[in-house]
C-alpha cells in the first residue's frame, strides 16, 4: 500500500470512530407514555383481623379480574387499617398475569388507598414485568369511589369459577375503575 492510501484508510477509520462515539453520547430514547384505562372486580378472603387499641387491621388475600388496557388476573394480599375516626388506609400488592396493551407476561401491581368522608383516593403503580412486560412501568389513580358488592360472588365482571380459578364465596368484593399511564422502557 502506498502512503496516500494508508492516510486515506486511517482518515476513514478515524471519522467512523468519531461518528460512533458521537452517537454513544446522545441521550437514551425515552419511552413514550401510553394512556391506560381499565377496571377490576376482586374477591377478598379475610386472613386475619386484629384490634390494636381503637384501630382494626384486616389482612385479606385478593384475586381480581382486570379488563381494559390490563386484561387478566391478579393474585395478592391487601392490608386495611380502620381508624377510630372512620377513615381507612390500605395497601395491596400482587402479581398480575395477562396482557398489558396487547403484550403478555406478568408484573407487580401495587395500590395505596385512603378512604375518608370526602371519598376514596387510590394510587396504583406497576413495574417488575416479565416476558413481553419486561420494562413496563406505570402509575395512576382510580376514578370515583369503589363499588362494594359485599359478601358472596360479584354479579358481573368476575366469575368465581373461571376468572380467576375457583375461589369460593368472597368475604367482600369491589369493582374499581383505573386511569393513568404506562410505558415500556426501550
How should each PLM-predicted stretch be described?
Residues 3-15:
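Bacterial N-terminal signal peptides that target proteins for export
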Residues 26-31:
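Sec/Tat signal peptide C-region and signal peptidase I cleavage site
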Residues 1-3, 25:
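Short intrinsically disordered, low-complexity coil segments enriched in acidic
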Residues 32-186:
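Beta-strand-enriched cores of mature, soluble protein domains
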